[in-house]
């Protein structure tokens, strides 16, 4: 299942706030505790990949 909903994140390479669709989203959690969802994004300006937190209601996709 592909990710389709754009998320507002801060691009660490440029420092700008951008709205991007994540390439992949996964759950990152310690054993037995509620974790966070992390998304993999590609910077539109530099082409570098970075990870950022996505909202908890965002579906896990690859």
Swiss-Prot record:
InterPro entries noted in UniProt: Cren7_sf, dsDNA-bd_Cren7
Post-translational modification comment from the UniProt entry: Methylated at multiple sites, to varying extents.
Gene3D superfamilies listed in its UniProt record: Chromatin protein Cren7
Cell location: Chromosome; Cytoplasm
Keyword list, A-Z: Chromosome, Cytoplasm, DNA-binding, Methylation
Pfam families associated with the record: Cren7 (PF11520)
GO function terms (MF aspect): double-stranded DNA binding
Binding partners and assembly: Monomer.
Family the UniProt entry places it in: Belongs to the Cren7 family.
Described purpose of this protein according to its UniProt entry: A chromatin protein, binds double-stranded DNA without sequence specificity. Constrains negative DNA supercoils.
Name used for this protein in its record: Chromatin protein Cren7 2
Organism for this UniProt entry: Hyperthermus butylicus (strain DSM 5456 / JCM 9403 / PLM1-5)
Encoding gene (name): cren7-2
